Regions:
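Tandem CBS (Bateman) regulatory domains
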Residues: 1-19, 58-92, 96-109, 121-140
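A short beta-loop-alpha structural element at the N-terminal edge
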Residues: 23-26, 92
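Short, basic/aromatic recognition patches
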Residues: 27-34, 101
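Generic detection of intrinsically disordered/low-complexity segments and helix-coil linkers/edges
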Residues: 33-38, 77
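A glycine-centered beta-loop-beta connector
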Residues: 36-39, 44-61, 104, 112-129
Length: 140
């Protein structure tokens, strides 16, 4: 079996999830709440109609909306673009798993979107994906 270090040189595309649940930037937070309930992921890439990454929305963002909604229930009608994180970190498919690990450790994020050069989301990689790669000794 290959050493855990061997898995660090493999490309992110070898461990990423390709079937990504994405959120359109204009949908209301009430719909995001339903999506989060259905899929139970911590974060979701937010995309434009063209599929380009514009942000990420997390369960933490939903908690902020919940707090704001205590005094104003109409806050759930606001678009996700109002509440999401902008300028998010992302990986490219050919980035190494080592790069992904470093970004996650340095940023404290649990997952990172994977995008092509044109900004279109092609996958997502989580801490579990990376741990599986290292434990499994995935290598070139």
């Amino acid at each position: 079996m290959a050493s855990p270090a061997a898995g660090l040189t493999a490309p992110v595309e070898s461990v990423m999830t390709s079937r990504v649940v994405m959120v359109l930037e204009e949908i209301p937070m009430a719909e995001v709440r339903a999506i989060v309930s259905r899929y139970d992921y911590n974060g979701f890439p937010v995309v434009s109609r063209e599929g380009r990454l514009v942000g990420v929305v997390t369960k933490g963002d939903l908690l902020r909306v919940l707090k704001a909604g205590l005094g104003d229930p109409d806050v759930w009608l606001q678009p996700v673009a109002r509440w999401m994180a902008h300028g998010v970190l992302a990986l490219r498919p050919r980035d190494s798993i080592e790069t992904a690990v470093s970004l996650m450790v340095d940023s404290g994020l649990r997952s990172l979107p994977v995008i092509e050069d044109d900004g279109k989301v092609v996958g997502i990689v989580s801490r579990n994906d990376l741990m599986g790669a290292v434990e499994g000794g995935i290598g070139p």
